[in-house]
């Protein structure tokens, strides 16, 4: 975060929206920090660091998991932030957005189920936190976890864009309902993070897409 702050690379969600709308003046290697799931560590660890370095960020939260000790993956022992922690998170400048209601994959759901997941999570976050929720991140976020129809439902419910977990940078003209991201693990060295901001990991998107095509091929 110190690196982003020092080089003026951090974007807000509003900045990204302006970029997607064609606004000039945004550096090509700018970064929007996103954090999925709403674990307690988003409040206890990430929030102070982001605040110290004046970094805007987006926390994608699953309302059905708020305050729980365990969630969708029993292998993860970390608790989830409660509503009071999420209010402190928004007060500190972190934007809270939707990660569905239950963290189930939307890819195999019916249209009515997708609509319910998207609408309920949006409404609950807005009502409990007093914020406007315009962004969504697909649970798991692989190509199997959303469809073109999913994006249309999100649009109808009132979202303006949605993030996947597919690897790649965001460019103008990209599908607003299939925004890629670049995953950075906590243990990765700073040089790799710097490389990512300079486009050095962009080529991995082709590997990501090729693997999906292999997995989706008949007989596999």
Model-derived features: where do they sit?
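Active-site-proximal beta-strand/loop segments in catalytic clefts of secreted hydrolases
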Residues: 60-63, 100-101, 139
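Hydrophobic anchor at the start of a short beta-strand
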Residues: 57, 96, 133
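C-terminal active-site subregion of NodB/CE4 polysaccharide deacetylases
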Residues: 1-34, 40-41, 104, 108-220
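Histidine/lysine/aspartate-rich catalytic loop segments that bind and position anionic ligands
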Residues: 81-86, 90-116
């Amino acid at each position: 975060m110190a690196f982003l702050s020092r080089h003026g690379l951090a974007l807000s969600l509003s900045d990204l929206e302006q970029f997607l709308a064609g606004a000039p003046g945004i550096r090509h290697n700018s970064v929007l920090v996103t954090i999925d799931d709403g674990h307690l560590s988003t409040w206890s660890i990430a929030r102070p660091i982001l605040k110290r370095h004046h970094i805007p960020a987006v926390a994608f939260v699953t309302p059905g998991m708020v305050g729980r000790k365990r969630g969708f993956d029993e292998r993860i022992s970390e608790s989830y932030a409660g509503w009071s922690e999420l209010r402190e998170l928004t007060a500190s400048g972190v934007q809270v957005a939707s990660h569905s209601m239950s963290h189930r994959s939307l890819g195999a759901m019916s249209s009515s189920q997708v609509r319910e997941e998207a609408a309920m999570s949006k409404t609950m976050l807005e009502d409990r936190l007093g914020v406007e929720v315009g962004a969504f991140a697909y649970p798991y976020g692989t190509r199997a976890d959303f469809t073109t129809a999913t994006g249309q439902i999100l649009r109808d419910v009132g979202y303006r864009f949605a993030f996947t977990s597919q690897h790649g940078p965001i460019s103008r003209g990209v599908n607003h309902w299939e925004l890629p991201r670049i995953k950075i693990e906590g243990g990765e060295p700073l040089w790799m993070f710097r490389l990512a901001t300079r486009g050095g990991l962009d080529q991995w998107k082709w590997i990501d897409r090729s693997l999906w095509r292999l997995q989706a091929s008949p007989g596999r």
